[in-house]
């Protein structure tokens, strides 16, 4: 008999499996808006539920149906529970249907077609048919709940459903899946109608050559809503072209019966045959033959509108129900030709097949597609070993058509056939006698001999067939005059309402868009063509003599043509405001010296603070280990809590057990929503540090370069609540809750040296990219601490340095993971805290915001110059340090520039910026904005200064600013005015106020959407546009990005999630030159609208 713990573990394992499957089904329902009945998640869910229901089932409850215990159980439950009784009836009907189908498959095929709704179920679906049907019928949760309430009748005592806790949990878990909609309608189409972005762009490329040439950017000034009665004729070619291309792709409603490329068609007599793709499609209603020129299939049509329209005119679409005869001509030296003759006797252009039996294969597919209602006359013959062959008949074709011949000659002899398409079981509408019986009076007006009759429908109905009198003629003129008058009134009415709508829209433009652009229009051609941009020769002249080109002219060149890549390093500091246009070389050198001095000073300040933080954390960790080691109730794993990459904090009044509990509640500081670390990681963390020793004192002193006082110890904690969350124990003190970022303790710092290498780590046993080891020996840990302490002594050993004994605290410590940011850091009021959307932590800031009286009495780390680093500042800096290190490590690692040394530069610049703006702190995405600057400038101090200038504008886009909502509102106004059709689609889908797919674009200035070379071009254009055309140029780039793909969005009726998915797949694959040109055109259009020219 299994032990009690083993049974409990089995129940938990079964329950965990069900939880996982429920989670997957709910995720599928949310992301795809429906759940496929044949989804693999349904199968695995049914298997998991069945395992739980059968666990501990009594043999008596299972009955004698050993092969299907679920069926026996549900049938027994059905005797006293109506939902289960109804389920049993449905499933038994399904089983009979499936069994009957299996039997009929052995017999006649037509009998199978008479079966009502034959279910197409996989073997696994049939295996779990009872659970599956109960789920789709929304009674599974009710039946399981009934089993839980009456478990003693059906289950042994160790069964999952007998457990007073696990049984109700299982029943509750099933409520969610039973509330969902399960359908085959959407899903059957889903695999065809939800193609990737590549597929959508490819389809659009094929048929876009026939779209209207007045694209959204070339429309009239204002886009009045289309009235189909007037503008529909212009739209028909584009719609038919799109539908034509869509029809070429097989979907759930249309089957591709035959496809062959390089089939020749001669559209006109005066031109050569054109190769193309011939395809035969079948739907439930009709069979269609299509032929598309290769130029359209390959997207290789010329740029001229004439060429595009001509090739679309050549495309052929034929409904087979309109075809009566097929004339087949075979030649010995070619593959064969098919001529289709329609019911009215018109012959279609011949299709010439290449060699290789393709004509016979086409006829075979056509004959199979006509079945069961239609057939070829004469039918193709079947020959053993060869399949379908041409019939060998002797002059049996109908009179009036070409004769089909047969002979005893070889098969490759030239032979002609005429096949007729007939439908034996139906009354043909193409019978010649029916046509002959039609009276001349009942013919369409187009076929009437008298042209006058066709102009007036009333006369043609009342007049005689012999011809009309003069009365009829006079009678016809009255409706004609009335028709002309109506047309005149309609034209005037449309013109008036169009003018009225124009005036209203123009008022909206002036109200909402006038502030988005500069009202002075700068020409790209005056005083010279700006298409070449700012070249090296022009820049060299300007540097030698700043009076040769005015600032506005340089900005105009950059706006219309960009900056030559070789001179970007020299030009960008001017664009970003590091230098002012017109500065002399001496003035620029003075600015550089000031920036280098300021950067060195900032570096020394935060490096000094970082050194104190890291050493203090080592002290706290060692003290915590000593206390935890003395506890007799602790298991052996807690003796190895120190991980060399761990993040720790010294929390007062905490026991070792609460430390272990909080250890498992640490939140990752990335922007993901993962809150809990895995148990394996916790055990590994505990196993790697049991041998760390505590050092009672550390040598401490003032940092290099004479550290000045940073901001006060109480900077605003605005926007850090989610990054500084705490746990629920009310006795935590922020005075001692510092985080350990033990990756790179600042090593051997040289006084007066502010170079990048000041921030490098000298820990002999650690590396940022090294994977954690299973264990650290005691000796290795001690050596690591000694090396770190020696590095700190060297850094602090400056004349006048002062040793400061850091306070030691008793109590538990919490061991965490590198990069955590979920610790208390401030003593400010909760009123100043706000949420960050990047979800640094999901734990609320609670009692640890208050500083205890005992903590206030303890000394803070100080330098010899009197600078005091308050515990609050240490906490706040450490929180941001971990965020920075996490983002730096994953910043564009695939790009060639970001080696380990350059990543260190990136970290130094970001830490320096955050030190100067500690009240704002680091937010995910800032590294993305700094990275391109560092790539171009390749100088820490210069990149730091330019990044500071850039963030003056970009800071407002982050959560602590309010610019993002303004961007969304402006995007709404722009799309409403410039592309009303797209706006209507978004309004229809309820997304017109939520342009969240633009969020990443505005946050990072399109950095994630483009490759690096394109990012450089877009950024410098944005910076120049502020002075040339618009300070909100990012809006027009975003609008251009939408407009480039607007036809794809409209054609596929994309909603909010579809648009996000599409642009995520298209990231780094956009044509930046096209987008920038379109953005400039859009700016110019708005400027023209405002001027009302």
Swiss-Prot record:
Residues 256-297 are annotated as: Important for interaction with RAB9A and RAB9B. One of its GO terms (cellular component) is Golgi apparatus. It holds the Pfam family PH_RBD. Residues 647-676, 702-736 have a biased composition (Polar residues). Belongs to the RUTBC family. This is Small G protein signaling modulator 1. One of its GO terms (molecular function) is GTPase activator activity. The keyword Cell membrane does not apply. Residues 687-696, 766-776, 820-829 have a biased composition (Basic and acidic residues). One of its GO terms (biological process) is positive regulation of transcription by RNA polymerase II. Interacts with numerous Rab family members, functioning as Rab effector for some, and as GTPase activator for others. Promotes GTP hydrolysis by RAB34 and RAB36. Probably functions as a GTPase effector with RAB9A and RAB9B; does not stimulate GTP hydrolysis with RAB9A and RAB9B. Transmembrane segments: none annotated. Interacts with RAB9A (GTP-bound form) and RAB9B. Interacts with RAB3A, RAB4A, RAB5A, RAB8A, RAB11A, RAP1A, RAP1B, RAP2A and RAP2B. No interaction with RAB27A. Residues 385-397 have a biased composition (Basic residues). Its main location: Golgi. Disulfide bonds: none annotated. Residues 301-350 are annotated as: Required for interaction with RAP family members. The gene is Sgsm1. Residues 36-190 form the RUN domain. Gene3D superfamilies: 1.20.58.900, 2.30.29.230, putative rabgap domain of human tbc1 domain family member 14 like domains, Ypt/Rab-GAP domain of gyp1p, domain 3. Residues 562-1026 form the Rab-GAP TBC domain. InterPro entries: Rab-GAP-TBC_dom, Rab-GAP_TBC_sf, Run_dom, Run_dom_sf, RUN_SGSM1, SGSM1/2, SGSM1/2_RBD.
